[in-house]
């Protein structure tokens, strides 16, 4: 049974209210980073893969957003995942070299935060992604987006709010609350107006 099928009362009793309840270990190793340390920042969270057909497009656009908007308070977070077509089959220690020499290649280096490989769907999903999927069950640009090809579904249980492929995006406000989810087809760079709107808001007096 999907977590989404549990009673609303049970979920309300235990569910975190923001991403600040979660932590993740950086790709380079070391101690887990609490997302609470990013309080007040606008976050763009993506499940990434280094061998996907859109790796070049999305990684370079993630870099561009971080470069342009990072000084104003945007933090881009990438979470490698091998659940979609086995397109992140490298070990954690190999991913940066894959990005540098293969895709995007040409010496590419991500300027945003990358974390260790994790699962985003199923019983072993990283708690952050389980939370994001509950908070935003479908992409705002394509509410029908879901994985429909059985040969690519390698996780269990299968839920309606599952991430459908690499490079789905979650935009999180400066209070840590998820605001919008975008499908893999929505260009990363086209999220810029939504990010700009959040960065332009006056800080809450609460």
UniProtKB/Swiss-Prot annotation:
Modified residues (Phosphoserine): 37, 200, 204
Location(s) in or outside the cell: Cytoplasm; Mitochondrion
Entry PTM: During periods of oxidative stress, Sec-52 may react with a superoxide radical, irreversibly lose hydroselenide and be converted to dehydroalanine.
Record EC number: 1.11.1.9, 1.11.1.12
Molecular function GO labels: glutathione peroxidase activity; phospholipid-hydroperoxide glutathione peroxidase activity
Record site feature (Subject to oxidation and hydroselenide loss to dehydroalanine), residues: 52
SUPFAM superfamilies tied to this protein: Thioredoxin-like (SSF52833)
Catalyzed reactions per annotation: 2 glutathione + H2O2 = glutathione disulfide + 2 H2O; a hydroperoxy polyunsaturated fatty acid + 2 glutathione = a hydroxy polyunsaturated fatty acid + glutathione disulfide + H2O; tert-butyl hydroperoxide + 2 glutathione = tert-butanol + glutathione disulfide + H2O; cumene hydroperoxide + 2 glutathione = 2-phenylpropan-2-ol + glutathione disulfide + H2O
Keywords of the record: Acetylation, Cytoplasm, Lipid metabolism, Mitochondrion, Oxidoreductase, Peroxidase, Phosphoprotein, Selenocysteine
Active-site residues, as the UniProt record annotates them: 52
Entries under Gene3D superfamilies matching the protein: Glutaredoxin (3.40.30.10)
Residues recorded with modification N6-acetyllysine: 91, 117, 151
Entry-annotated residues carrying N6-succinyllysine: 91, 117, 151
GO BP: any one term: hydrogen peroxide catabolic process
Root EC class: oxidoreductase
GO CC annotation terms, alphabetical: cytosol; mitochondrion
Pfam families per the UniProt record, alphabetical: GSHPx (PF00255)
Function recorded in the entry: Catalyzes the reduction of hydroperoxides in a glutathione-dependent manner thus regulating cellular redox homeostasis. Can reduce small soluble hydroperoxides such as H2O2, cumene hydroperoxide and tert-butyl hydroperoxide, as well as several fatty acid-derived hydroperoxides. In platelets catalyzes the reduction of 12-hydroperoxyeicosatetraenoic acid, the primary product of the arachidonate 12-lipoxygenase pathway.
The family this protein is said to belong to: Belongs to the glutathione peroxidase family.
Assembly behavior: Homotetramer. Interacts with MIEN1.
Protein name, per record: Glutathione peroxidase 1
């Amino acid at each position: 049974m999907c977590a989404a099928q549990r009673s609303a009362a049970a979920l309300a009793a235990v569910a975190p209210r923001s991403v600040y309840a979660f932590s993740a270990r950086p790709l380079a190793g070391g101690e887990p980073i609490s997302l609470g340390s990013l309080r007040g920042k606008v976050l763009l969270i993506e499940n990434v893969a280094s061998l996907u057909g859109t790796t070049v497009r999305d990684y370079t656009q993630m870099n561009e957003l971080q470069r342009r908007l990072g000084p104003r308070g945007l933090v881009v977070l990438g979470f490698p995942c091998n659940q979609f077509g086995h397109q992140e089959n490298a070990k954690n220690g190999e991913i940066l070299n894959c990005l540098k020499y293969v895709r995007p290649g040409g010496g590419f280096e991500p300027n945003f935060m990358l974390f260790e490989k994790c699962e985003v769907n199923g019983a072993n999903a990283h708690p952050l992604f389980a939370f994001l999927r509950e908070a935003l069950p479908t992409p705002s640009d394509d509410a029908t987006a879901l994985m429909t090809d059985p040969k690519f579904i390698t996780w269990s249980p299968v839920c309606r709010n599952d991430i459908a492929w690499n490079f789905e995006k979650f935009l999180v406000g400066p209070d840590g609350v998820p605001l919008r989810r975008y499908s893999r087809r929505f260009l990363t760079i086209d999220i810029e107006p939504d990010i700009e709107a959040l960065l332009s808001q006056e800080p809450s007096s609460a």
